[in-house]
Design a protein with these regions (language model features):
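Residues embedded in well-ordered regular secondary structure
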Residues: 1-51
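Surface-exposed loop/interface segments of Gram-negative outer-membrane beta-barrel transport/assembly proteins
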Residues: 1-3, 41, 45-53, 59-138, ...
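Outer-membrane beta-barrel channels and translocator barrels
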Residues: 18, 29-30, 65-71, 148-150
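Hydrophobic, lipid-facing positions within transmembrane beta-strands of outer-membrane proteins
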Residues: 19-23, 58-62, 139-143
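Transmembrane beta-barrel domains of outer membrane proteins
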Residues: 24-28, 63-65, 144-146, 158
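Short, Φ-rich (hydrophobic/aromatic) sequence segments
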Residues: 143-145, 149, 153
Length: 202
């Protein structure tokens, strides 16, 4: 018979923990109200063999509104978010390990040879790859006021400034591994290769 290989079992973790923390403070003092929020998210990726596969996010928000007098109310708020995704840098988007995980037949070998040398297969590509990352940052500031002219008329003004940045760090993976695309040559115990003729004779 033939040995069957389970690529999903070799590459995908059975579980991936997520940690989330949120803190919110709000209150009012006189004619001034405020709200402060802080958040942290840490998610582990599903890759079993990658050096790093996770996602982290930090976010914060603050808002203040104050009625200075019966004619003027001012307000200000701000939001900040920092997201960072780390993942195995395969360097190939058209035929990455996730594609081959389901494309390859269960007969394709995974792991190492009988001599302990790694094979070129999806799980080893992830293990041998460098860690790439994608970081997104977002910043937003709002300023405004309300001017009460009469009992039934008021003027509202709001100004918003925001900025978003995205930074990607990628690398080229270099590794040595045995090819599985070609018919392997068997070995006998003393380390010599085994060759057979057309009649199957050694």
């Amino acid at each position: 018979g033939y040995r069957l290989y389970d690529a999903a079992k070799a590459m995908v973790r059975n579980w991936a923990p997520t940690m989330s923390h949120n803190l919110s403070v709000n209150g009012k003092s006189g004619k001034t109200s405020y709200n402060i929020g802080l958040g942290y998210l840490d998610q582990s990726g599903m890759s079993k063999t990658a050096k790093k596969d996770d996602f982290k996010r930090y976010n914060a928000s603050v808002s203040v509104t104050s009625e200075l007098n019966k004619y003027l109310t001012v307000r200000a708020s701000s939001i900040y978010s920092d997201r960072n995704k780390r993942y195995p840098g395969i360097g190939n988007t058209s035929a990455d390990p996730w594609l081959y995980m389901y494309r390859w037949s269960p007969l394709f070998p995974m792991g190492v040879t009988e001599h302990g040398n790694p094979l070129k297969e999806p799980s080893y590509e992830m293990a041998a790859s460098n860690t790439d990352n994608l970081q997104n940052k977002y910043y937003n500031v709002n300023l405004g006021f309300t001017l009460n002219i009469t009992k039934n008329w008021d003027v509202k003004f709001d100004y918003t400034y925001d900025r978003q940045t995205s930074e990607t760090n990628s690398s080229v993976t270099q590794y040595e591994a045995g090819a599985t695309w070609y018919a392997p040559t068997a070995w006998i115990e003393n380390g010599s290769q085994v060759f057979a003729n057309e009649q199957g004779e050694r």
